[in-house]
Amino acid sequence: MQNSFYREIVNDHNLRPAHKHDLPGANMELRGVNPSCGDDITLYLYVEDGIIKDGAFTGDGCAISQASADMMLDLIIGKRKEETLHLSELFLRMIKGSVSESELDELEEAGALIDISHMPARVKCAVLGWHTMESLIDPKIIEAEE
């Protein structure tokens, strides 16, 4: 990360993740693994009436995977499933280096991971939580990617 402000955001989410805990009462749960890096998370969501009311994750991994999952949950809690999938699509496009400035603003703190697009070895780390969330909310997305 070139920008120290972005680095600080990532470090804060890695060292003090607000959403890294069990979530009793979650009605959706899925494990995501990145075998190339050893990242292993389980994502928990509580969804009611199509809105993500709460979310959490557990597991271990590198700073990027842990921070990304925490930032993602900050962003998606309180959103409708459709909005969440839109944000995920923006995040994945950002990681590939193809988002506009206004789209980047929609990602809030998750936009701090923009420089990952220049670090191919870290891309899978950054997208693990997002892919896990997509699989949980809309399994058809993952089937289409395979």
Region annotations inferred by a language model:
Residues Y46, A67-A69, E134-I137:
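Ubiquitous "structural anchor" signal
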Residues Q66-A67, H86:
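Alpha-helical macromolecular-interaction surfaces
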Residues M1-K20, P24, K79-E146:
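C-terminal binding/interaction regions
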Residues I41, D70, K124:
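Active-site phosphate/pyrophosphate-handling residues
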Residues C37, I64, A121-R122:
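Secondary-structure capping and boundary motifs in well-ordered enzyme cores
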Residues D60-Q66:
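Short, thiol/selenol-centered motifs that function as redox-active sites or metal-ligating centers
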Residues S68-G78:
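Alpha-helical support elements that line or immediately flank enzyme active sites
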Residues R16-D54, G59:
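Structured beta-strand/loop patches that form or line metal/cofactor-binding pockets in enzymes
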